[in-house]
């Protein structure tokens, strides 16, 4: 799907940004994560993957804050997959700040430092920007991917989540060729 207007990207000049829109509670996002991880490992140097937690409703905000706090603390690589596992395998409720704080402490993270960043204005700003980006791409469900600020695809459009990354690879070629 080609967007009617270009969406701003954060990727450095000379690179193409792919945005994954996700929600930690989404079982489809959880199932897609291993495929996305494998795809990310083989990305060419001119492609940058950015993960963006969606905020369809107010209930999504604690997990948006969780993601951006992990990112701010440099813990995304260590804990991103663990958040999915905590929710989908261990069946923990990580939908509120209090339960998130309890879980984060069990991961060996300084709860006070985490809490200060979680409640910070900077994380609040990033949550708002994420929701604005999701709206600019017209995200209706997750997981979904934006490509180069010009294209958008998801499992329904591609026929399955298994085909989404093939579609993204095709769209990357289009962006590179200037189409």
Task: Write out the residue ranges for each language-model feature.
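Extracytoplasmic thiol/disulfide redox context detector
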Residues: 1-58, 131, 173-179
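Sec/Tat-exported extracytoplasmic proteins
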Residues: 22-25, 40-43, 70-74, 87-91, ...
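Solvent-exposed loop/turn segments at secondary-structure junctions
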Residues: 25-28, 55-59, 85-90, 122-123, ...
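Conserved strand-to-helix beginnings and helix N-cap segments that scaffold or border functional pockets
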Residues: 30-33, 60-64, 158-161
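Extracytoplasmic/secreted envelope proteins and their assembly/folding machinery
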Residues: 33-40, 63-67, 80, 97, ...
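Structural microenvironment flanking redox-active thiols in thiol-disulfide oxidoreductases
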Residues: 42-73, 77-105
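C-terminal cap of thioredoxin/glutaredoxin-like
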Residues: 106-179
């Amino acid at each position: 799907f080609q967007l009617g207007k270009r969406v701003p990207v954060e990727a450095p000049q000379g690179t193409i940004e792919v945005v994954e829109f996700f929600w930690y509670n989404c079982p489809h996002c959880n199932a897609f994560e291993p495929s996305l991880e494998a795809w990310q490992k083989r990305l060419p140097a001119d492609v940058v993957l950015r993960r963006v937690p969606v905020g369809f409703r107010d209930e999504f905000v604690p997990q948006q804050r969780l993601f951006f706090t992990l990112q701010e603390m440099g813990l995304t690589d260590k804990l991103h997959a663990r958040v999915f596992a905590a929710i989908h395998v261990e069946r923990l409720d990580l939908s509120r700040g209090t339960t998130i704080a309890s879980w984060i402490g069990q991961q060996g993270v300084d709860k006070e430092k985490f809490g200060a960043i979680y409640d910070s204005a900077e994380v609040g700003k990033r949550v708002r920007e994420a929701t604005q980006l999701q709206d600019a791409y017209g995200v209706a469900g997750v997981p979904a991917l934006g490509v180069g600020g010009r294209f958008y695809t998801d499992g329904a459009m591609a026929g399955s989540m298994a085909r989404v990354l093939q579609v993204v690879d095709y769209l990357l070629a289009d962006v590179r060729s200037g189409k």
